[in-house]
Design a protein with these regions (language model features):
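Catalytic nucleophile-loop/oxyanion-hole region of alpha/beta-hydrolase
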Residues: 87-88, 94, 107-142, 280-286
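Short beta-strand element of the alpha/beta-hydrolase
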Residues: 72-81
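Hydrolase active-site cap/lid region
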Residues: 160-218, 232
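C-terminal catalytic histidine-bearing segment of alpha/beta-hydrolase fold enzymes
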Residues: 252, 258-315
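Short beta-strand/loop motif that positions the catalytic acidic residue
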Residues: 238-240
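Gly/Ala-rich beta-loop-alpha elbow adjacent to hydrolase catalytic centers
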Residues: 147, 151, 155
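A glycine/proline-hinged amphipathic helix-loop "lid/cap" segment
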Residues: 1-69, 217, 298, 302-318
């Protein structure tokens, strides 16, 4: 099935960003951040979701609070943007839609960004916020980490760091189009290079350089979760668009995690761009994907789901 007309909004936005970066390859980090703050445009404002600023473990954050949600459950959400751009504000609507779909709360972290703060500052901030929630009395099994693109990496890497620190692990991890391999070895970097409107090898190399800095190698097992061990990792939901260059990262992690005993789901929706759930409230493909995640979450937490899902996008799942 061809992508919906509404899904073209994201492709057009990404193409506009790409054109602007090609026209001015020396855009300052400040101008890049200003441009990528437009990431908040694709998602429509979720109905009956309130927002509140907070500070958790020293990290600035925005709570997304759906009316009637289970306040004992929360998502720690890390935004995308190559570890260097994007913000809690640019991603609050996406987090709000996810929280509403799961009937939980979400807290979107404005973690320290590269290049001013290279690895591992971002992971340190995510873990600090998570620990603050534990100190507030949250049950770890009722917490989830989630994120998109580079933030999907952080959602996964922060859980790995929690395991290393022997902290109670979150009950689940959700990653939209995670960028995992700082060594850039994925086959779809080449095979999907003409269908992905935003993410190519050049932009990834630049972002990886800012994130890793001068002291971290591309195959460091926390900066690059594909190099890590996933034994004992929480249940994992991976989502990707069929047209994106980072698809291989999700496929590789899914296979590795599954082989090591992780309860993992990979949902790939054909014809979709990078982080297409950013279209939540606008495009049916995004809303249907959130419905599938919600059904998975309900089954995971409660052993059943009452949801009736439309799967017109025909995702491939494994």
């Amino acid at each position: 099935m061809a992508p919906s007309k509404q899904a073209d909004f994201l492709r057009a936005l990404y193409q506009d960003w790409t054109d602007r970066m090609v026209a001015d390859p020396n855009l300052s980090i400040a101008n890049l951040r200003s441009m990528f703050d437009e990431w908040g445009q694709p998602a429509l404002e979720p109905e009956n979701v309130c927002y509140k600023s907070d500070r958790l473990g020293g990290v600035e954050a925005i709570w997304a609070l759906p009316v009637g949600a289970d306040n004992s459950r929360a998502i720690v959400y890390t935004h995308g943007g190559g570890f260097a751009v994007g913000s809690a504000d640019s991603h609050r609507k996406l987090a709000g839609h996810l929280a509403k779909a799961l009937n939980v709360t979400a807290v979107v972290l404005h973690y320290r960004r590269a290049p001013e703060h290279p690895f591992p500052a971002q992971i340190e901030d995510a873990v600090a916020a998570y620990k603050a929630l534990l100190e507030k009395g949250f049950d770890a099994t009722k917490l989830s980490t989630a994120g998109d693109s580079a933030g999907g990496n952080l959602a996964i890497a922060s859980a790995l760091k929690m395991r290393d620190l022997r902290l109670p692990l979150p009950g689940s991890v959700i990653a939209f189009s995670p960028w995992l391999d700082m060594a850039l070895r994925g086959a779809t970097l080449e095979t999907n290079s003409t269908t992905d409107a935003l993410v190519g090898r050049g932009i990834l190399e630049a972002m990886a350089g800012m994130f890793l800095g001068s002291k971290t190698v591309p195959r460091d097992p926390l900066a690059n979760p594909l190099e890590n061990d996933f034994k004992g990792f929480p249940p994992l939901y991976l989502n990707a668009g069929g047209d994106e260059t980072l698809l291989s990262d999700s496929e590789t992690l899914h296979a590795k995690a599954k082989a090591q005993g992780v309860k993992t789901v990979l949902s790939v929706v054909p014809g979709m761009q990078h982080v297409f759930p950013a279209l939540s409230g606008r495009a049916p493909e995004a809303d249907e994907e959130l419905g599938r995640i919600a059904a998975w979450y309900e089954s995971l937490c409660f052993g059943h789901t009452h949801r009736q899902l439309r799967c017109g996008t025909n995702p491939t799942r494994s």
